[in-house]
Amino acid sequence: MAQSPLMIRAEGLVKHFGAVTALAGVDFSAASGTVLGLLGPNGAGKTTAVRILTTLLVPDAGHAEVAGFDVVRHPQEVRERIGLAGQQASVDEYLTGRDNLVMVGRLYHLSTRQARQRADELLERFELADAATRIVKNYSGGMRRRLDLAASLVVAPPVLLLDEPTTGLDPRSRMGMWSVIQDLVKDGTTLLLTTQYLEEADRLAGHIAVIDHGRVVAAGSPDELKRSLGGERIDVQIRDAAQLRLAEAAVARAVGRAPELDAELRRLTVSVSTGAQALTAVVRALDVEGITVEDIGLRRPTLDEVFLKLTGHEAELVGDPSEVREGA
C-alpha cells in the first residue's frame, strides 16, 4: 500500500532571536490526512515552528515545505493552502459571528453570496448558529475559539495549523474542540497541532514530536513513546507502613525483580512484562503475607511520564522567544 504524500515537512530548522536559540535543528513531518502533535511547554519552540510554516518567520537555517511548496521560496502558494488558528482568537469582537466569517470569505475573494453560504455552513458545524447575529464581544471563550477555528476553514484548506487551540478552555469546551478536530481529519485535512496538554496529544495525534529547548528530543506514535518507558507496571499502596519491607519482599518474589519504594506514600512500583499474570501473582503473594492493600493496579506509562523523563520537568508556562521578540 502506497504511503500518503507528505503535506508538512521540516528539516534542520534553526531560528535565533538575538542570543536566544528558539529552534536548534528541528525535523518533523506529517502525511496527508494525519495529525502531527508538537508537544512541549511554551518556550520550547513550538510557536516559532508554526510561524515558520505559515511564512510569518524566515528560518536562519534548514527548510520547510507545506503541501509541496517551500515556505521561503513560495510563500504565496503556501498561504493559499493553509489555515491557522493561534493561541488567541483573532476574530473582530465588534462584529457578529456571521459577519466575521463573511468578511474572511470576501478577503479570500468569495462572492458575497458564496461567503454568506459558507459562513452559515460553518456556524452550523461549530454549533454557533444560534449566536450568529450576536456581537463576538459577548461570546464565551469557547465560542470565540470555535469561531476562530471556523474562520480558518472558510476556504477549506488542505493543511490546518492549530497553535494550542484549547488553552484556557474549560473541559467541556475542550472536548467539543477535540470532536471538531477529529471530524476535520476524517474529511482528509492534515493537521499540525501544538499543545502542552498531554491528554490532548494522546487523544488526537497519530504522531508526536516532543520539543524541548528548541530540539526534538523524541518522536513516534503515542504508544511508541509510552513503550519507550518499559511497558506496563504494577502499583501497590499498602495500608500499614510497618509492612512496607515485607511487601517489598513479597512483590520481588512474585515478579522476579525488586520494586521501587515510596515510603511516604506507602507505595511500591515494579515494571512487568506479563501484565495480568504478574498482577495475579503479586495479589496472591501479598495475601499470603497478610498484607492489607489500599490500592493495586496494572498501569501503562502515560505521556505525562514520558514527557517528564525526556525533559526533566513538567509543562510549565513560559514565554516563547518568537512572541517576546514580536512584542518588543
What positions do the PLM features span?
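ABC-family P-loop ATPase nucleotide-binding domain
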Residues: 1-14, 313-328
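Conserved short beta-strand edge segments in small beta-sheet-based binding/regulatory domains
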Residues: 260-261, 292-299
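ABC transporter nucleotide-binding domain
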Residues: 179-273
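Topological signature of polytopic alpha-helical transporters
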Residues: 254, 267-269, 284-294, 315-328
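Hydrophobic/basic alpha-helical segments enriched in Actinobacteria
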Residues: 14, 20, 33, 44, ...
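Short proline/glycine- and acidic-rich turn/helix-capping motifs at secondary-structure junctions
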Residues: 264-273, 299-309
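Preference for bulky hydrophobic residues occupying beta-strand positions
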Residues: 15, 28, 236-238, 270, ...
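ABC transporter nucleotide-binding domains
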Residues: 5-10, 15-212, 217-218
